[in-house]
Amino acid sequence: QPASVKSLVPSFTIEGSQITVNGQPQTSSDNAQDFTQKLSYTVSNSKGVSNSYEIDLNRFTGLPVVYLTTSEPVLSKEEYVNGTFLLDGWRHYESIDQMDAKIRGRGNSTWFLHPKKPYQIKLESKRSLFGMEEDKKWLFLAEYSDKTLLRNRLAFELGHRSTLKWTPSGHFAEVFVNNVHTGVYHVTEKVEDGENRVNIGENGFLLEIDQPDRLDADDVFFQTETYLINIKEPSVDYGDAKFTEVRDHITKFEEILLGKDFADPEHGYPAYVDIDSFIDWFLINEVAKNVDAQWYSSIFLHWVPGGKISMGPIWDFDLGFGNVDYADATYPEGWWVRWNTWISRMLEDPAFVERVKERYADLDAQRPEIKQDLAGWAEELELSHAENDRIWQTMGRYVWPNPVVYDTYEEEVAHLEDWLDTRMDWMKEALERL
């Protein structure tokens, strides 16, 4: 549990006649101060000459700290374990006193392959973490394969700069589980239905293109000619009216998209989809060369009856931006998500292509700001990544599926920055040739 520094009583010796804080005289071992804030101590001598000294207390790595306790080990992705949650927000974020919570594992390869485990927590009541919109459920991404810790954060930033209706937010925090430091985690919002998340209202659907071996036993899905589509929300049963409604609508959209007059503005795919959402989803995943987004998984879309099908939210980029060694997605050159069946067909429509070029030009114009953000996040993690590596010792060794191995965090970040620049330069030229 964190020691309180909001009312800390310092001891000191001075060479002078008086010491004050904000004009108030101070006595050693007597006057409490709030050291979550920067303080200015002024020392004066008998002649009235004074000097001021800034006190800036930095706790641990400077990141907020989350303390989780569990009644038993977290060994399952399916079953919650009872526990507690406490957030020490330090000076940057609102702290949250200890409250009841439930904790379970999450993820697929990230859960089964790596020792640093990702978690999902469910608070006893809705709370805002790090200024994000309040909710009960929060994800703790371990970012074990991504030694920069920044790829998901970078993708989320691209999403926030796009026309996508909602993109998850996340913030870094040190995490202690049962008083054992488990390193830095990326605490994020979950892709789920909710007023403050994917707002599909009472009648909408949140869907995910997925794979049979990734489904849970109670998942309900349907298959188009091209994809297996998992109905994430709402809860439906096979054959009921809601199941039939969404299956028939998505199937009809795909039939029209792959049909003869697919680009007709009134009767083709434009009548069915929010085109800008498809374009921005495509561009973000293509810039990242996100290995799973071509056809495999974490491809989300949502639809409210009476409206158009929208792509998104974006999700799962720890193996993006070249961080994969088993596919051409390793390299910053070459198309990848462009070969997604739906996107590939839309790129046969000249109007779609022109809009893609316009949207990419807007994104590329923001590249200096994006790179500045990336450098700022890396600086924010300057102390934290060192503590994280002290625990997990991933620097300088291969972690699945890293295509390159560097000895230092700075080299890992530089590689990501260089890869991003090369990728965006390549896409700028390649789009002109479409």
Task: Locate predicted features.
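Short, solvent-exposed loop/turn and secondary-structure capping segments
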Residues: M132-E134, R151-N152, Y185-V187, G194-G201, ...
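Short strand-turn-strand beta-turns centered on an Asx-Gly dipeptide
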Residues: N22-G23, D88, N178-N179
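Structural recognition of the beta-strand scaffold that forms the well-ordered cores
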Residues: P118-K122, W138-A142, L149, E157, ...
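Conserved NTP-binding catalytic cores of kinases and kinase-like/nucleotidyltransferase enzymes
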Residues: N58-L154
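Middle-to-C-terminal accessory/interaction subdomains
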Residues: V74, M99, T110, H114, ...
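Internal "kinase-insert"/substrate-recognition segments embedded within catalytic cores
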Residues: K122-S128, A142-Y144, L164-P168, V180-L283
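Short, well-structured beta-strand/strand-turn elements
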Residues: S17-V21, S162-E174
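Beta-rich interaction/scaffold domains
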Residues: Q1-L63
